[in-house]
Curated annotation (Swiss-Prot):
Gene that encodes it: MT-CYB
Listed GO biological process terms: mitochondrial electron transport, ubiquinol to cytochrome c
InterPro entries: Cyt_b/b6_C (IPR005798), Cyt_b/b6_C_sf (IPR036150), Cyt_b/b6_N (IPR005797), Cytb/b6-like_sf (IPR027387), Cytochrome_b (IPR030689), Cytochrome_b_C_euk/bac (IPR048260), Cytochrome_b_N_euk/bac (IPR048259), Di-haem_cyt_TM (IPR016174)
GO cellular component, one term: respiratory chain complex III
The species this protein was found in: Microtus liechtensteini
Membrane among keywords: yes
Gene3D superfamilies found in the cross-reference section: Cytochrome Bc1 Complex, Chain C
Protein name as it appears in the record: Cytochrome b
One function term, GO molecular function aspect: ubiquinol-cytochrome-c reductase activity
Transmembrane keyword on record: yes
Length: 380
């Protein structure tokens, strides 16, 4: 068996990636989220495939086909709710994975980090298009509002929006193409994940100290396969509790009303995992400025390697930057809350303050804190 594992041209790739891979001996549970994201992706592709067997991407029948899946298909309700809540679990793991990367300075592995940002954009695009497919009120109006943001692009904006819509409004053509893209993107994401792993295995994993761990490595299997399996069990338990006991807690009641272009819901808002970006978008009165801020809220992550001023990699031994980091986490929670609130006083001013704080902490305060810590520790 060992000979096949190490000699077979295909199996040896798996062997070098998941079995004999040298891994730091001290990586904590924060390093579990990569494998959990892989599990989430697998769940989403499988449940999505079964949903696609019964779904029809036509404005006249899309809503009914989802109802049919829930009522008439064997365990259709379970597949549908696993897919809907699987997206939420996916984003919870994504945010924790990115948060871990920021805390421990993993962004210094630039290729891996940039690939991760591309993956984040791809997953967000996939989730957005998936939200449109049930063709409920929030699906329709969410698609209208978000795609309409592209009209803020000078000169080509309006043409671009109509090109994406396939007409003069969100309609049958839009739904059909969104279904096509929503189906193909997870497979593209899978390919990007392999590239992400390829880049990671070029440098090796980071660890909680942020120090070089070449002198202290252990094989990935059995140590981290067992550890990852524990993470998988915990995630699946949380996931099934959410899916079986509280399937609608993260959804919007408006999406149980069929899409109606003549009736606008009182509060148009995306799914919870986009609310922080939506709050940043709404906090700027100018349309183009809002769109730029929305894109920058994610793209600012690409600047992190350039903004790293500390002589240390991780925040483990850097209390000042640690404080900034946790303020940033609190700020993101505030933005998520604001994104779900109506556009009125005091929510507008809170959203604007939190948006300014978000960019200020990442681009100004954390680099300054890094320099201060260098001086305190005489690391210059």
């Amino acid at each position: 068996m060992t000979i096949i594992r190490k000699k077979h041209p295909l199996i040896k790739i798996i062997n070098h990636s998941f079995i004999d891979l040298p891994a730091p001996s001290n990586i904590s549970s924060w390093w579990n989220f990569g494998s959990l994201l892989g599990l989430c992706l697998a769940i989403q592709i499988l449940t999505g495939l079964f949903l696609a067997m019964h779904y029809t991407s036509d404005t006249a029948t899309a809503f009914s086909s989802v109802a049919h899946i829930c009522r008439d298909v064997n365990y259709g309700w379970l597949i549908r709710y696993m897919h809907a809540n699987g997206a939420s679990m996916f984003f919870i793991c994504l945010f924790l994975h990115v948060g871990r990367g920021i805390y421990y300075g993993s962004y210094n592995m630039i290729e891996t980090w940039n690939m991760g940002i591309i993956l984040l954009f791809a997953v967000m695009a996939t989730a957005f298009m998936g939200y449109v497919l049930p063709w409920g009120q929030m699906s329709f109006w969410g698609a209208t509002v978000i795609t309409n943001l592209l009209s803020a692009i000078p000169y080509v904006g309006t043409t671009l929006v109509e090109w994406i819509w396939g007409g003069f409004s969100v309609d049958k053509a839009t739904l059909t193409r969104f279904f096509a893209f929503h189906f193909i993107l997870p497979f593209i994401i899978t390919a990007l994940v392999l590239v992400h792993l390829l880049f990671l295995h070029e440098t090796g994993s980071n660890n909680p100290t942020g120090l070089n761990s070449d002198a202290d490595k252990i094989p990935f299997h059995p140590y981290y396969t067992i550890k990852d399996f524990l993470g998988v069990l915990i995630l699946l338990m949380a996931f099934m509790i959410l899916t079986l006991f509280f399937p609608d807690i993260l959804g919007d009641p408006d999406n149980y009303t069929p899409a109606n272009p003549l009736n606008t819901p009182p509060h148009i808002k995306p799914e919870w995992y986009f609310l922080f970006a939506y709050a940043i978008l709404r906090s700027i009165p100018n349309k183009l400025g809002g769109v730029l801020a929305l894109v920058l809220s994610i793209l600012v992550l690409a600047l992190m390697p350039l903004l790293h001023t500390s002589k240390q990699r991780a925040l483990t031994f850097r209390p000042i930057t640690q404080t900034m980091y946790w303020i940033l986490v609190a700020d993101l929670l505030i933005l998520t809350w604001i994104g779900g609130q109506p556009v009125e006083y005091p929510f507008i001013i809170i959203g604007q303050t939190a948006s300014i704080a978000y960019f200020t902490i990442i681009m100004i305060l954390m680099p300054i804190a890094g320099m201060i810590e260098n001086n305190i520790l005489d690391l210059d």
